[in-house]
Amino acid sequence: GTGAITEMIIPNLRPDAKFIAMEINADFVKVLRERFPSITVHEDSAANTPKYLKQLGAEHCDSIVSGLPWAFFSEGLQDALLDGAVDALRPGGMFATYTYITSYPMPSSVKFRNRLRARFSEVGVTHVIWANVPPAMVIWARK
């Protein structure tokens, strides 16, 4: 995307934190690099996050925050992306994404949450954030 989530994360990072962003769309990569010159943005699939962690000298990361539209992805793409996330996260690491209340009951969204449960030790959903338009919830998972 264009950095709405990134904009919220950066001010809350620890001083010693390393932050990388993954974006597959070249136009969005350009926007992100212009908006956030202090971070590293890779033009690649999030499924390849482990490769970029290794380039940083890190085997794993503490957390992954995703703004991907999971309910609209094929099962194969969901699997590839989630497998990359699991490989990238340290034991106990956290994965977080969001869903809109309108897509939460969709069969593909239900299947996505089942995929999370199959890969993570703990999965949960926050309360509905009614101030968001459209209302949304955060789905989180602990490795």
Model-predicted regions and their roles:
Residues 25-26, 45:
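Conserved SAM/SAH-binding beta-strand->alpha-helix loop
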Residues 89-99:
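Conserved beta-strand signature within the Rossmann-like core of class I S-adenosyl-L-methionine
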Residues 52-63:
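A short acidic, Gly/Pro-enriched loop at the edge of an enzyme's catalytic core
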